[in-house]
Amino acid sequence: PVGTPTAVVQIIHGLGEHSRRYLHMISALLDAGFVVIADDHAGHGRTAMQSGVWADAGDNAAEVVISDELTLQQQLAGQFDDLPWVVFGHSWGSMIARAMATRPGTRLDGLALCGIVAQPRGFETTLDHKTLAKAMA
C-alpha cells in the first residue's frame, strides 16, 4: 500500500473467476492504503489454465475453499495483527465469506459482500444462520 497500512482486505472471488479479475479494485485499495490479499480457489486461475479443469475443487468444494481461505488468514495474520481485517466476497465468494463469518477463529472486523447469491442446495450445513446474524450485528 501507499503509506502506512490502514486495514487488510481479503478478496474472495466467485465461481469460475480468478483473483486477477479484481486488479482494478486491488490497485484502488492499495492506493488508498489497504493491504490486499487475494488468491485463486482450487480449480481456478493459473492452476485451472494449466490443468484444463475449470471451477472444480472436488466433491466438497465449498469446504475446501473455506479451509483454504482460513488457512491463508492464519498464515498471514501474524504480520497484520494490529490492522482490522475485512473480508470481501463476490458471488460464490460471498457465500464463502458468509460461511467464514460463522467459523470460530476467523479474522473478521468487516464483511463486504457483492453479487450476493442465495444459498444453493448442499450449502445448508455450511452456514449457521444464528451465528452469522450475530457476527453481522
Predicted regions span which residues?
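Alpha/beta-hydrolase fold nucleophile elbow
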Residues: 80-91
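Alpha/beta-hydrolase
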Residues: 12, 39-41, 114
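Active-site glycine-rich loops that stabilize anionic/oxyanionic intermediates
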Residues: 14-17
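Short beta-strand-to-loop junctions in surface cap/lid or active-site-entrance loops
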Residues: 1-5
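Conserved alpha/beta-hydrolase
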Residues: 28-52
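Alpha/beta-hydrolase-fold enzymes
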Residues: 96-137
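Alpha/beta-hydrolase active-site loop
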Residues: 57-78
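Short N-terminal helix/helix-N-cap motif within the alpha/beta-hydrolase-1
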Residues: 19-23, 46-49
